[in-house]
Each structure stands twice: as structure tokens, then as C-alpha cells.
């Protein structure tokens, strides 16, 4: 399993950090730092634009609660 560290495109001081998302198998070849992605964000899973800033093979958080990248923009 591959995970991407993503900065969400929202201006808010509490969101000034990265969030980790699972990378679906079909997108593994496309995901790299600098790529723009669409991700579900927040309790309502609102679709937001984000920027990949890093890739990892280990989850920083509980992998079962990690959301999945929806697509590449």
C-alpha cells in the first residue's frame, strides 16, 4: 500500500499541515510530489483539490481510517 502526504487547497490556519491519503492501485504510477489530486476532506467528505508533497509505504495514522485519493487533476 502506498500513501501520499497531501496539502489541501484551503486557506485556514488550522489546515496548515499535510494529510495522508491512500493511493489506489490504479493511480500508483501517477502519484508523485507536485501532482494535483482530488480528495475527500472533512466529516462531509467534500471533494477538495490538494497537492502531493510526499510518498510513503507506511501509514502515519490508523490505516483503516485513512481516506483514498479520488483522482489526479
What annotation goes with each model-predicted range?
Residues 1-73:
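Terminal, basic amphipathic appendages of nucleotide-handling enzymes
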Amino acid at each position: 500500500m502506498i500513501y501520499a502526504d497531501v496539502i489541501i487547497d484551503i486557506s485556514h490556519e488550522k489546515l496548515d499541515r499535510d494529510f495522508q491519503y491512500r493511493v489506489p492501485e490504479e493511480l500508483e504510477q501517477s502519484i508523485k510530489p507536485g501532482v494535483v489530486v482530488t480528495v475527500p476532506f472533512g466529516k462531509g467528505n467534500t471533494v477538495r483539490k490538494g497537492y502531493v508533497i510526499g510518498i510513503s509505504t507506511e501509514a502515519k495514522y490508523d490505516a483503516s481510517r485513512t481516506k483514498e485519493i479520488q483522482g489526479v487533476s
